[in-house]
Amino acid sequence: MLLYLNSTLCSIISIMYKITNVSFVEYYSNNVSKDVIYSYLMNSTCSNKGTIKLNLESGKRLKQEGPYILPPIRWLDSFEKNAEFTILCEVDDIK
């Protein structure tokens, strides 16, 4: 029984969810290039499979729909005041 639980736990832990694709639907920023955002997001660990939608409107807080990025991306909340973007990220399991 213990061996079964241990092997089950190991197989659960070995499945990781990572961002495998980043698409910029809309992007405007004076200070931060797309390359910086892309580098941060690509291969980030996530809570589960699916599509993440990140949306920031000028002067507003970041809205995130879909799986959570781990650790949370709080620094995007303090993005420059006039920045605007809509970014889609595909999350898949990496074994």
Swiss-Prot record:
UniProt keyword annotations, A-Z: Plasmid
Classification via InterPro entries: Plasmid_pGKL2_Orf8 (IPR020120)
Pfam families, A to Z: DUF5474
Superkingdom per UniProt: Eukaryota
Record's function text: The presence of the two linear plasmids, termed pGKL1 and pGKL2, in strains of Kluyveromyces lactis confers the killer phenotype to the host cell, by promoting the secretion of a toxin able to inhibit the growth of sensitive strains.
Protein name: Uncharacterized killer plasmid pGKl-2 protein 8
Organism from which the protein derives: Kluyveromyces lactis (strain ATCC 8585 / CBS 2359 / DSM 70799 / NBRC 1267 / NRRL Y-1140 / WM37)
Species classification: Eukaryota, Fungi, Dikarya, Ascomycota, Saccharomycotina
